[in-house]
Amino acid sequence: MDVQIFPHRLLGADTTEKLLNRLEDIHGVKRMVIHGQRLPPEDHPDRRIINVKGQEFELQVKTGRVLLEVEDEETITDIKRVCEDLLPFGYDVTPGKYIRTEKTVTDEIKYGESLDEIPDELIGLTDQNARLSERATIIKRKKEH
């Protein structure tokens, strides 16, 4: 099951970083995808390295939506609680199907024979128009003991 968080304004780098870290703390969240307008390649205050649970990556978009793959509906309550804390300007949380999980004909055209080499965890996470180096960053959940 997927959930979309749609903030009522674009998020800056600091808010995006805080939101992703808090969402990563929720047990039922399996993976996250951020969407938004691409930041300019030159110096921009929001184009910086952010840290999510010890993993660093360059933020390349002004966050407009956060898509989450979750284990069950109970997780939505925890997601809303995080949004209430960090998004005082308003937001919508909507369950639905947002992240593709199957390879498509478009993927086959784009990637050709190398399609079989793409890990299943990357399916549905990449921007078809982006350069390979900008496609996706996977934030691995730390194993709990």
Curated annotation (Swiss-Prot):
Subunit relationships: MCR is composed of three subunits: alpha, beta, and gamma. The function of proteins C and D is not known.
Which biological process terms from the Gene Ontology are attached to this UniProt entry?
methanogenesis
Keyword annotations: Methanogenesis
- Protein origin, superkingdom: Archaea
Q: Which InterPro entries match?
A: Me_CoM_Rdtase_D
Q: Does the keyword Transmembrane helix apply?
A: no
rRNA processing among the record's keywords? Answer: no
The disulfide bonds in this chain are none
**Record protein name field:** Methyl-coenzyme M reductase I operon protein D
